[in-house]
């Protein structure tokens, strides 16, 4: 997944959940655990759905290889005491169908496909026997992965010569 797609998803999820952008982080980043509410994101299972479609670009000899690609985005919501992270994620899942959000995703070249069932991961922490309200959901998305290449193909060939009977000829391809 490219950086622009990551940034778009990060910022959109923060907006849809009504959180500051600093409260949404990519999983496995170095640093300390932030104050709740906190959302972690992890993208995995990225897979091309078909062979790449090779299209010429505006630059001579350059081609863009475009592949429709699916991936899963795990969203974990760590809530405050007395909150219900399952409800927050349920709201997040429903919002991907809003016309304004659909416009945003289309402009970013991303499509929301579906969400797996939300899991309530609330559990006891440490010896204090305090509950940590937490829930997770896997969101499935599609985007077009693009790789640009200049394979060095010969686009044009000109051959000039003479035949035994002195006939001039030119071949262009």
Task: Describe each PLM feature range.
Residues 131-173:
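Hydrophobic secondary-structure block in the mid-to-C-terminal portion of proteins
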């Amino acid at each position: 997944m490219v950086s622009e797609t990551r940034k778009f998803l990060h910022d959109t999820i923060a907006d849809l959940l009504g959180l500051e952008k600093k409260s949404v982080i990519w999983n496995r980043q170095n640093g300390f655990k932030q104050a709740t509410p906190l959302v972690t994101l992890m993208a995995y299972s990225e897979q091309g759905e078909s062979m790449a479609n090779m299209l010429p670009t505006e630059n001579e000899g350059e081609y863009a290889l475009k592949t429709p690609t699916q991936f899963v985005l795990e969203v974990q919501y760590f809530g405050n005491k007395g909150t219900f992270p399952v409800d927050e994620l349920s709201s997040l899942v429903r919002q991907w169908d809003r016309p304004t959000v659909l416009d945003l995703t289309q402009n970013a070249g991303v499509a929301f496909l579906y969400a797996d069932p939300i899991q309530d991961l609330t559990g006891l922490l440490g010896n204090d026997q305090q509950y940590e309200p937490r829930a997770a959901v896997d969101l499935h998305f599609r985007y077009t992965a693009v790789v640009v290449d200049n394979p060095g193909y010969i686009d044009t060939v000109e051959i000039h010569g003479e035949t035994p009977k002195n006939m001039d000829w030119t071949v262009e391809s």
